[in-house]
């Protein structure tokens, strides 16, 4: 009898923990309204990172936009043009090779290249700030070609 009672309780627990389907109309209501900019800055940043792409990568000692970066930046421009109400900061980064001064200047050139590219696609220049961190904030530690490639980037950060 005790086994039946435990099975009955477990079954009731499973049934009661099932998700309800609502009205059954089939119309899903989004929990975050990314398209109109009504979500928090953190939610927008997560959306940018996961759904659009928040990083453009560069070749060694280069600041020009390559095909892979252009693909990401075109998606960013489309999203930014359809999502008003906030600014972005473009953070330029470099790998560990080179002097601090050289890498700060290269990171700034990279951030400015991304800004010019986004503006050419219709993003309001007044929404964009640039900053260089040079080699001071690596995304990947180590002195390997993979780590260096990961660190040669511009990251788009959502502002207010």
Model features per residue range: what roles?
Residues 19-87:
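Periplasmic peptidoglycan-binding/tethering modules of Gram-negative envelope proteins
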Residues 14-17:
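C-terminal motif of bacterial Sec signal peptides marking the signal peptidase cleavage site
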Residues 93-160:
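Periplasmic OmpA-like peptidoglycan-binding domain that tethers envelope proteins to the cell wall
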Residues 2-8:
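Sec-dependent signal peptide recognition
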Residues 1-2, 19:
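N-terminal hydrophobic targeting signals that begin at the initiator methionine
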